[in-house]
Amino acid sequence: MPSILEDPTTKIPPPESLLLSLKSSSLNTPLKTTTKTGANVTLYPITNGPLSLPQPLLRFLHNEFSAEIEMGCTYPMEQPMKFEAFGEYWFGMFGVVAVLDREGDGECELSVDSERDWEKECLGTFYVKPNYPGRCSHVCNAGFLTTNAARNQGVGMVMGKAYLHYAPLLGYKYSVFNLVFENNVASVKIWERLGFSIIGRVPGAARLANSETPVDALIIGKDLTGEDVVDKD
């Protein structure tokens, strides 16, 4: 979800702790996990901006995000971003890409030369950035996208757990999601299972394509200090 008061064409300056954390070897280490369907997945942290990604992958993710916006059900934007703007918006600070493992695959990073069938092998992505500027920049926000081919496989939960791994390593102390639309039941369930709480509500905040009446936006938060990831299910 977009950071509070954020114009997608601008960027809230990162906290100093984030700039230091981006050099950490633990932050740059991919995570390996398994979805509920038994698929092996690697989550690759992206710390060097959109140009460090394979451009076919970036274009695929741009197309997926554009389709999500045009669907009009989960993000507040009404028009898709241009390709260059998307790359900076999503990967300009810190992002993660979830990729299906291939048998015998020893690849430990996504280089600009990586060649994959991204439509089949890229499962999703998320970004992490400050939710507020300056003295409040230790509070973070994130945006998530599960690719169309990977839906209903538990990828959202995998990325949610990865978010709770990386966000504290980036120096963030608290997480806020500003606009989780109440009718996005799957998203709400994921965050509740991971120990998040509903800390606010904006009545009738969204005019969504999947509702004839305005939908409430939930503000969902979690303290990131000294807590392990707990799946409550």
Language model region names:
Residues Y163:
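Conserved alpha-helical elements of the SDR catalytic core
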